[in-house]
């Protein structure tokens, strides 16, 4: 399987996001990236939008519902939201949407900070493997993977996608 070029996806996502926000009458959203890949995608997206807005970052480790199964990520960092959440239009950015559990955790954390006016979900990739009813408003590409395959994003400069075969990693 050949993977798409993240730089090309980001350019298209910037166009699609502008159209989505314009259609909804949103002119000054707050941007939030989910660590770590979502922060990289958010940085690239803000650059493509030529938008100097501050970027908030979320570390959702303590909000995940699979915490007891997977344990704590070894490098938990605090979330950093340099703006109010209450009443704001938010653009929540993640790198890869798979089960939907990371986005659910991010939404739970955001609501602990306040009640946003709206949340627009932007993902570089949607793996169409959702376990929860969560879909991105703006997506770079939708891919279908075999059960033993995963996509890894490396970055931040340049962003690159790698297909990993878990069956050969054992």
Swiss-Prot record:
EC number: 2.4.2.9
CDD domains to which the protein is assigned, alphabetical: PRTases_typeI
Protein keywords: Glycosyltransferase, Transcription, Transcription regulation, Transferase
GO terms of biological process kind: regulation of DNA-templated transcription
Catalytic activity, reaction form: UMP + diphosphate = 5-phospho-alpha-D-ribose 1-diphosphate + uracil
EC category: transferase
MF terms in GO: uracil phosphoribosyltransferase activity
InterPro entries (alphabetical): PRibTrfase_dom, PRTase-like, PyrR, PyrR_bifunctional
Sequence motif PRPP-binding, location on chain: 90-102
Top-level taxon: Bacteria
Chain's role: Regulates the transcription of the pyrimidine nucleotide (pyr) operon in response to exogenous pyrimidines.
HAMAP family: PyrR
UniProt family annotation: Belongs to the purine/pyrimidine phosphoribosyltransferase family. PyrR subfamily.
Stated name of the protein: Bifunctional protein PyrR
Organism: Pseudomonas savastanoi pv. phaseolicola (strain 1448A / Race 6)
Lineage, highest ranks first: Bacteria, Pseudomonadati, Pseudomonadota, Gammaproteobacteria, Pseudomonadales
Designated gene of the protein: pyrR
């Amino acid at each position: 399987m050949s993977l798409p070029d993240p730089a090309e996806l980001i350019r298209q996502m910037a166009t699609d996001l502008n159209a989505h926000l314009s259609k909804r009458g949103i002119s000054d959203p707050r941007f939030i990236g989910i660590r770590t890949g979502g922060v990289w995608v958010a940085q690239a997206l803000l650059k493509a939008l030529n938008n100097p807005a501050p970027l908030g970052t979320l570390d959702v480790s303590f909000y995940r519902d699979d915490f007891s199964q997977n344990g704590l990520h070894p490098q938990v960092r605090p979330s950093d939201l340099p703006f109010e959440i209450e009443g704001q239009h938010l653009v929540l950015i993640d790198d890869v949407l798979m089960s939907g559990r990371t986005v659910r955790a991010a939404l739970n954390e955001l609501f602990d900070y306040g009640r946003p006016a709206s949340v627009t979900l932007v993902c570089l990739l949607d793996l169409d493997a959702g376990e929860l009813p969560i879909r991105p408003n703006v997506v770079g590409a939708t891919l279908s993977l075999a059960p033993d395959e995963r996509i890894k994003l490396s970055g931040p400069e340049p962003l690159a996608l790698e297909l990993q075969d878990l069956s050969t990693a054992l």
